[in-house]
């Protein structure tokens, strides 16, 4: 039994996966009388349960073998499957670095997994001295790292990330949802080096397909075989697979749009610091900015009252709003309305 198998829950190791009709017969042509589908209608056939065409396109884009690619119904499904595969309910633990993406903790609660919280340091980076004692905990199975981090926007020090991967006995899940805006190297280049690393990316951010719900996980085949084993058989609809494929057929608009958003993020940061109600704007590697303002609740209410919706993060980070970089026109309207607020 290899290291990955030892980390997996015994019932998951022993699970005989559901075999769908399209697992047993993969060809596209024929008279299909095997899946109890209607013979009528434009969307009458079940989708490809393994998303072969889409995974092949992603393989070409990322330069990775198809067997190292898993697709989820959004990254939230990948997060949930991590808990289901590796954590025994009521026994095992996961670790997060708050303030960070909230679904790590929500999924843990749904799966009855205890969460250890190691707050980020004063620079919103990983506190290595604080986390190191937990790395030998035999009950700790998962560590979630978000880089660039939501809601702070910064990338974690890659050396600190790698220190955790090398020294942790369990699985490290690195969430790179915003990596396309950072200009940094992705850790997908390292999945061949580390058998305990899962890297998540998404179609929701730079690719502009949040409505389609397509999340990506990159890891060793030894890990991903369990994801394919326990996932629902048809977790990505035909419509969403086709939409993602269409988006990948011409990548130039995505690159242009990403560059535009990075430029707007920088411009927005420069303009925000001149507004009286703004106290601080943190550097960002994402498509948003963390902004400290005077009386965040009041500023939030005034902006939403003018149909400008930002995210109030003052409960997690005192006095802070998270502001997404929009179009130039949207950003100018935000700046104009924010400049009118007197507190």
Where are the regions that the model predicts?
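N-terminal "arm"/small-domain region of PLP-dependent enzymes with the aminotransferase-like
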Residues: 1-61, 139
């Amino acid at each position: 039994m290899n290291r990955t198998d030892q980390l997996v829950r015994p019932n998951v190791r022993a699970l005989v996966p559901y075999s769908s009709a399209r697992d047993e017969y993969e060809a596209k042509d024929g008279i299909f009388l095997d899946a109890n589908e209607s013979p009528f209608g434009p969307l009458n056939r079940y989708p490809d349960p393994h998303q072969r065409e889409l995974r092949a396109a992603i393989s070409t884009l990322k330069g990775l073998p198809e067997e190292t690619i898993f697709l989820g119904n959004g990254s939230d499904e990948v997060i949930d499957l991590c808990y289901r595969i590796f954590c025994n309910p009521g026994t095992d633990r996961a670790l997060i670095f708050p303030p960070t993406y909230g679904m790590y903790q929500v999924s843990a609660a749904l799966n009855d997994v205890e969460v250890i919280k190691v707050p980020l340091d004063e620079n919103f980076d990983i506190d290595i001295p604080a986390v190191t004692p937990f790395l030998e905990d035999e009950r700790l199975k998962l560590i979630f790292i978000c880089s660039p981090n939501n809601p702070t926007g910064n990338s974690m020090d890659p050396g600190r990330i790698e220190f955790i991967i090398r020294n942790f006995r369990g699985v490290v899940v690195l969430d790179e949802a915003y990596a396309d805006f950072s200009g940094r190297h992705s850790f997908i280049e390292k999945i061949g080096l580390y058998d305990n690393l899962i890297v998540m990316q998404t179609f929701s951010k730079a690719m502009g397909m949040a409505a389609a719900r397509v999340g990506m996980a990159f890891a060793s085949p030894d890990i991903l075989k369990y994801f394919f084993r326990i996932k629902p058989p048809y977790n990505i609809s035909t419509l969403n697979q086709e939409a993602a494929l269409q988006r990948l057929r011409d990548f130039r608009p995505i690159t242009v749009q990403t560059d535009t958003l990075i430029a707007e993020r920088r411009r927005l940061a420069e303009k925000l610091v001149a507004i009286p109600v703004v106290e601080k704007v943190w550097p960002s590697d994402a498509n948003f900015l963390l902004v400290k303002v005077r009386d965040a609740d009041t500023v939030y209410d005034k902006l939403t009252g003018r149909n400008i919706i930002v995210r109030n993060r003052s409960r997690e980070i005192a006095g802070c709003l998270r502001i997404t970089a929009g179009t130039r026109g949207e950003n100018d309207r935000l700046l104009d309305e924010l400049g009118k607020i007197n507190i």
